[in-house]
Amino acid sequence: MMNRVIVGAMGLLAAGAVVVGCSNDKPAGAAQVSSGSNAEVKVDGKDLAGLDLKSVTCVKQGGNINVASAAINGQQGLGVVMTDEATPKVTSLGLVYDGAALAVSEGMGAKVGSADVKVDGKTYTITGEASGADVKNPMAGMITKPFTIKVSCG
């Protein structure tokens, strides 16, 4: 029963993070978009299989930086929302790794995972630990995996 509550809470956190991450009070302005940015995505020290790295797109708009990708044959996907400031902060991150839906999120009184962002010119390196549940076996409990995402934006 507890695992069902955890999985349900993870889903609500992820949905809430997307809504919060995609909304703000700042004027929209013109978006800065870059794609095919030689992205690197590693989870647990390995390349994230099934992710179309050429499709990784970075959009700077309205005070946020949104990083997203397409999947190959519907396997994996990646979504990151971070603040567009001198020291960016990840507000939400979601990815699927080996059948597990993993996230970094902070909201509604709960914190899931952790992430740090380093900036070198137009290159953003996001490192941390994402937590979640195996969607094939949600009763197995929470899992946490280290990740590194490197993407060029601008």
UniProtKB/Swiss-Prot annotation:
Signal sequence coordinates: 1-21
Cellular compartments annotated: Cell membrane
Disulphide bond pairs: none
GO (cellular component) term, any one: plasma membrane
Keywords: Cell membrane, Lipoprotein, Membrane, Palmitate, Signal
Lipidation residue positions, type S-diacylglycerol cysteine: 22
Protein topology in the membrane: Lipid-anchor
Pfam families reported in the protein's UniProt record: Myco_19_kDa
Lipid attachment residues per UniProt (N-palmitoyl cysteine): 22
Family classification: Belongs to the mycobacterial 19 kDa antigen family.
Protein name (Swiss-Prot/TrEMBL): Putative lipoprotein MAB_4074c
Organism: Mycobacteroides abscessus (strain ATCC 19977 / DSM 44196 / CCUG 20993 / CIP 104536 / JCM 13569 / NCTC 13031 / TMC 1543 / L948)
